[in-house]
């Protein structure tokens, strides 16, 4: 066992709170507070879906074709900062993102190909 990090916050970006809430219905922030106050209760999971984030950059531009001006049932949020795409070489190299929720693990590529562009 190796200690990697001790941190008073949840995971970065949208991953901890937003994606957990979308996938399971569980309030992750409330859970963190309950752990800190030593009153944590086992969560009641109300949803069993998949969610994720796709970051917009030069390498992922094909996934975003025709998504820019359209909305799809699986699309929770999109944030496009610029269409002057740059190549991602690190964690913060992105030009926007989209957040999705769907019923099956990792079907988004197929859904985008089917509904986003041909």
Place the predicted regions along the sequence by residue:
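Active-site "cap" helix and flanking loop/linker of ATP-utilizing ligase/carboxylase catalytic domains
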Residues: 8-59
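Protein kinase-like catalytic core scaffold
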Residues: 2-5
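Long, Lys/Arg- and hydrophobic-enriched amphipathic alpha-helices
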Residues: 60-118
């Amino acid at each position: 066992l190796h200690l990697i990090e001790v941190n008073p916050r949840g995971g970065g970006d949208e991953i901890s709170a937003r994606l957990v809430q979308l996938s399971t219905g569980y309030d992750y922030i409330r859970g963190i507070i309950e752990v800190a106050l030593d009153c944590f209760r086992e969560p009641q999971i109300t949803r069993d879906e998949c969610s994720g984030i796709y970051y917009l950059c030069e390498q992922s531009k094909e996934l975003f074709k025709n998504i820019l001006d359209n909305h799809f049932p699986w699309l929770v949020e999109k944030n496009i900062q610029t269409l002057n795409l740059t190549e991602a070489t690190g964690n913060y190299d992105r030009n926007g993102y989209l957040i999705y929720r769907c019923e099956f693990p990792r079907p988004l590529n197929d859904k985008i190909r089917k509904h986003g562009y041909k």
